[in-house]
Amino acid sequence: AAYYAFININEYDRQLVEEHNAYWVNINKVPTLLFDHAEMVCKAHHLMRIQATTTPIAFHLLPEHFTLTQLQNLYEAINGEPIDKRNFRKRVAELGYVEKTKLIDKLTSRRGAALYKFNEEDYKKTLKFKL
């Protein structure tokens, strides 16, 4: 049996990782694994892609306020391929539960990027997700 989980990279037990000499690897650059573990990783990645495009789970991997670039980068990492910026932003706007805030991110953008947030209450009213 194999298990996978989406976790926020800022919210894991660092001590546990150090005790087991574990480390993060890029899903597209997984080193050689023993037994059927490579197959398990491929299956988990496939399931993660499905879950990330049919449920809003990815929003829990971002900070409370995020830029659309951060959201797009996350989906590109999960899917392993680039996404057209204009089409992605159009799809996000059509969701109806990703709200633009009045906050501006000046740390990762020279001009200052608008910050957004996921409105879980609005999502629960529709329970429809397709990104």
Description of each model-found segment:
Residues 1-2, 113:
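Broad gene-expression machinery/nucleic-acid interaction feature
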Residues 53-131:
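Core RNA-modification/binding signature centered on pseudouridine synthases
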Residues 2-9, 13-49, 64-69, 87-96, ...:
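NUDIX/MutT-family hydrolases
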